């Protein structure tokens, strides 16, 4: 892998590398990237999807790689960490330069940080959490939220941070001590910058300045990149959001917001007349008219807020500057969202739009827009004019790199690309069994009684040690209930506690079961006997009513391709590979992956899905599987 990465960097080409767990892929891309940086003076950006891998790269792997490069070249490469602006403490806000924010950030792009976070501070009140942050602020050298352990809630952190747009910049009296400014200065001088996929998503959405200049891009956990980029490009709007922005502008900038409030009410009326679901024919006339009125109102309020900002003057001269900056950012962000919604992006099939009503509470309906295809923006903003290495344990779907290459924009980029599978240190056929019980019925709307009985039989044979991956929360809850009712096993269920707490408890008990949904399919690393059985209730196709998948499939079909295989089957293959990959995490792991969906064996697309999974020994024989699980449970 190191040779392949070195060649891609030297030739400024693009490389997909499938490297299984245990191959040491972090060192395999860090060393050649660092050598190139110190010899050619060209910076590399390394991006991860999860906080866990980001920490591993920064704290463990990068120092090891730097040691090796220094011994070889005589020069030690420098490494810097870069995150989104709001992930850093704002000294000026802490000192009272901004008013307390009593509402959530509404329209800024999703914060550029992996979502997994250790500790949310839920045991403490908001005030207690803020006090703890203030005490930590006196000693921190980085201001990085993730250095605060245990962590605090998003609401508490919002009291001590700002977005990049809300920052007062050089007008701030504490600009020279600003944590995000210092982080960006360090990144601009470093040989290697470690960041995350959310930052890449912001760059792909039209803000390349969030990243320092770089000639080499390395994307680890690359199978998640397209979804992260799409997430950054997804925006929502509701009457409640409009009302909150209006209140922010009135409170912090003192401007008149009557027209904006009325436009928000008109939006609510227009959305209330529409059913939930995708707007397949574009925006209905009444909704389009409501958005046009809202756009005009936003622009007027934005003009007024900007005038208020001029009157407030620089932060050093007025305590109002921070408050007005909050108002300006809220209105400007909403204006950008509304302008996108009133553009022709839906009619031109660049975006897909849908109406949805929150499941809980009395929130009004909201309108959401999401990009249909992100391959072009990835190719243009992230891959063009630089070497790129994209790696993951799951890139060759159905035995081919072509599906992921198309999804990630490599087929559109101006450079040559190749896919390389460097293999795995594991002997999957000896270490694990892939069990597909073809006697079960084809899955319907929910999980069947027969499938629940199979879950119980497998868990009892294994005497626990089961990770259950289910396609819906309801199915996971039913499985947890049945396991508790019919077995004496300890069962941990997603939603009953914080996910890190549940995973930690599961890892500590060899005979427990952990069941959940999508959050458990990727990133759960529990080696050893604790996870000797992975149960997947059905092939994880996208929901039939998912607007983005529908629109993507239609676009592929319209272009002459196979929409089902390109979108739905590829989505399912990726998740199956990730889910099955939870079983074997080290060379002495053994166990069973059970997919309770006969379509994996009987459907025409089943072979494509099976080839995407680790090459476990396949069987349909229930007795063989139950016997193997019994021996594993007995420690044989």
Per-region residue spans from a language model:
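A contiguous, basic/glycine-rich beta-loop/short-helix subdomain that forms a polymer-engagement track
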Residues: 155-191, 206-208, 308-438, 446, ...
